[in-house]
């Protein structure tokens, strides 16, 4: 069992779907039957209903009991004691470290989606850590949200989207990709961000004309937030650069991504170009503050060791005071 993942869900939340997806063997300590049913229901909804599950209660005691079945077949489990789940997922751990999910894997409908190559670069520029809190503002189909959730396996991703159709697509894509640390926030930024935890990384795919307000809101929550934006127009790119200059943020990195894909035409192949996209990224810094002469807290007094100071380095007043 040295290759099994050990997870305790007793009194805390864990992104169990991601753990199951990444490992062939998972031991999970759970609190009660209701929590077990919730886990089995979510596994079934996320396409893992046929994964083998063993539920052990009162282990090592005379009344020890172990039930074995698939997640789907055990949906109505009724035991009430503290239990251990042992989950065997034969396809666990087969996903690449960097997701790079093909475009046709996502359910799209009529909602715009960040394409695969641009998405991979944007995710890399976000510099997401495993326990990161990530915002995807204007999430669309949730393609960025899903890949971010695959990287931040111990964190949480918040997909902010106002359109009902897109909200349902995000939920569907989260289920298809087995990520349960992705949360759909219904509404428009910046108002929809108010109750969310402070972000480590923010991707902005759409701002509905409120770009500056969104940037102000996320920087207020975390002055050191990492930001990545996708833009089609020069005007949007210039807006971002103007904002970084006016707010004394480090200079933004701007790259243009122009992707062409081979397309078969008869017996030949020709390159079919996609629209070029600007990928803009920067790490926020707190705005510099002018010292207020009326506020003592704006000034720092430096302690001086007088034994290390030569008299000729001092002003006359200080020398006079010391030598008295």
Predicted regions: what they are:
Residues 1-22, 190, 248-272, 276-278:
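Class I SAM-dependent methyltransferase SAM-binding "motif I" and its flanking Rossmann-like core
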Residues 25-110:
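A contiguous loop/helix-start segment that scaffolds small-molecule binding in enzyme catalytic cores
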Residues 85-87, 267-294:
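Core SAM-dependent methyltransferase catalytic element
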Residues 131-140:
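Conserved class I S-adenosyl-L-methionine
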Residues 141-153:
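Conserved SAM-binding loop of SAM-dependent methyltransferases across substrates and taxa
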Residues 156-161:
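Conserved SAM-binding motif I beta-strand of class I
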Residues 162-199:
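S-adenosyl-L-methionine
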Residues 224-232:
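Conserved beta-strand signature within the Rossmann-like core of class I S-adenosyl-L-methionine
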């Amino acid at each position: 069992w040295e290759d099994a993942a050990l997870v305790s869900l007793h009194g805390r939340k864990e992104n169990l779907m991601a753990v199951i997806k990444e490992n062939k063997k998972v031991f999970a300590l759970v609190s009660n039957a209701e929590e077990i049913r919730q886990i089995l229901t979510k596994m079934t909804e996320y396409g893992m209903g046929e994964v083998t599950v063993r539920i052990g209660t009162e282990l090592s005691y005379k009344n020890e009991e172990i039930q074995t079945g698939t997640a789907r077949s055990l949906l109505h489990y009724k035991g009430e004691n503290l239990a251990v789940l042992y989950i065997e997922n034969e396809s666990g751990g087969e996903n690449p470290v960097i997701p790079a999910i093909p475009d046709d894997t996502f359910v799209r409908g009529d909602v715009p989606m960040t394409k695969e190559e641009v998405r991979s670069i944007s995710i890399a520029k976000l510099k997401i850590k495993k326990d990161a809190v990530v915002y995807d503002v204007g999430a669309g189909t949730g393609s960025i949200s899903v890949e971010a959730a695959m990287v931040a396996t111990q964190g949480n991703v918040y997909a902010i989207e106002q359109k009902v159709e897109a909200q349902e697509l995000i939920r569907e894509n989260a289920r298809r990709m087995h990520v349960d640390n992705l949360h759909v926030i219904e509404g428009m930024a910046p108002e929809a961000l108010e109750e969310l935890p402070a972000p480590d990384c923010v991707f902005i795919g759409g701002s509905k004309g409120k770009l500056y307000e969104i940037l102000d809101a996320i920087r207020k929550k975390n002055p050191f937030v990492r930001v990545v934006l996708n833009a089609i127009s020069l005007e949007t790119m210039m807006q971002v650069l103007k904002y970084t200059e006016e707010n004394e943020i480090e200079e933004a990195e701007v790259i243009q991504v122009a992707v062409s894909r081979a397309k078969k035409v008869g017996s030949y192949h020709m390159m079919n170009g996609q629209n070029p996209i600007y990928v803009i990224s920067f790490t926020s810094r707190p705005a510099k503050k002018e010292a207020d002469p009326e506020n003592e807290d704006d000034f720092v007094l430096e302690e001086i060791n007088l034994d290390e100071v030569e008299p000729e380095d001092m002003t006359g007043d200080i020398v006079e005071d010391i030598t008295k």
